[in-house]
Regions:
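Thiol-/selenol-based redox modules, centered on thioredoxin-like
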Residues: 144-207
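N-terminal secretory signal peptides that target proteins for export/translocation
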Residues: 1-10
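Structural microenvironment flanking redox-active thiols in thiol-disulfide oxidoreductases
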Residues: 77-142
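Proline/glycine-enriched tight loop/beta-turn segments at coil->beta junctions
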Residues: 61-65
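N-terminal "domain-start" segment that seeds a small globular fold
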Residues: 29-59, 144
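Amphipathic alpha-helical repeat scaffolds
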Residues: 70-74
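Bacterial N-terminal signal peptides
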Residues: 12-26
Length: 207
């Protein structure tokens, strides 16, 4: 009788295994571009797999103000999705974008697949800002983007929890970092966004 149960368990696990393999494949597709960022001069050098597995070049946001935030669906700060979506809609037309990077590093609070995460964010918070594939954002296995962010931010050091927010100015440099406790709609965050949006877009570098 043990064999049928074993087979059933295996078959049940196939969708989960497929989701995991899909995420790994998506990251493998982007690894070359990630490695190019070892000598990066901006976080916008990096290419990540988006939530749908397609490569997402952060370079498309050159000249914009970018917030990169690691997210989780089962965290005490998950409700910040609502505020993030509101500021995204408020400032989007002025050249502001949010990049969500789901991660399971802290408390195992993002256990789902990329499809699960997309459904959760859309259903519960109406999220429309770009979401990336689930990634490692802390520890020795963290993706190169997060190595760059944590080393080049004015406040250096590894991130401690979900919903840490990095702000990148129109010049492509990391200019501010806000922790989990800082609400995305707080005066400190919105004032910084508005200050960065008021700055001119740098002229393209001469060939």
């Amino acid at each position: 009788m043990s064999a049928p149960r074993t087979c059933a368990s295996f078959l049940t696990s196939l969708p989960v295994l497929g989701a995991v393999l899909g995420t790994l494949a998506a990251w493998a597709d982007c690894r070359g571009a990630e490695n190019e960022g070892l000598t990066a001069t901006s976080p916008l050098t990096f290419t990540l797999p988006a939530n749908d597995g397609k490569p997402y070049a952060l370079a498309q946001h050159k000249g914009q103000v970018v917030m990169i935030v690691n997210t989780a669906s089962k965290c005490g700060f998950t409700k910040q999705y609502a505020g993030l979506e509101r500021i995204y809609k408020k400032y989007q037309t002025q050249g502001f974008v949010i990049i969500g990077v789901p991660a399971n590093n802290f408390g195992g609070q993002e256990p789902g697949s990329d499809a699960d995460i997309a459904t959760f964010c859309t259903k519960n918070y109406g999220v429309t800002f770009p979401l990336m594939a689930k990634a490692e954002v802390a520890g020795s296995a963290k993706i190169p983007l997060y190595t760059y962010l944590t080393e080049k931010s004015p406040k250096t050091g590894g991130i401690k929890w979900n919903f840490t927010k990095f702000l990148i100015g129109r010049d492509g440099q990391v200019v501010e970092r806000f922790g989990s406790m800082e609400d995305p709609e707080s005066p400190e965050v919105t004032a910084t966004i508005e200050k960065l949006l008021a700055m001119p877009v740098p002229a393209p570098a001469k060939p």
